[in-house]
Amino acid sequence: MRLPSLDIDSWCLYSAEAAHDTLPDSFSIPSFEERNGLTRGNAARLLFDIMVTDEQGERRSFQEIMWTIIAERVDGTYIGILDDQPGCLEPRSNNYLIFGAEIPFLPEHIIEIAYPPGDYSDWQLNLNPERCWPR
């Protein structure tokens, strides 16, 4: 499965592993075993790089940390449902990144793990995704 890229999608995910290797004392991440063992309904926090065209027509890069609720895993790739709205984007029809969009990611992208209440995860995962990532 293809992962997002700035060139194609105008957004991508930073590697939490690379960030940790660069700044091990100030950027901690869960163990690989924890990041690799998540299941449906668990939450994973990811670091996004988002390209936005400003009012002057200039392209600018914004970084946002957002949560996803894991829906499934396909051939080693997690598919999470975005559980945040990017602050740098308007929630309109031409933006892929909106609350409820499918987000593909790998264990290397996870910066934090949470275990939301089951009723919340069930609610989020029983909705149809607002955006579906190509399989």
List PLM regions with ranges.
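Mixed-charge, low-complexity intrinsically disordered regions
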Residues: 1-135
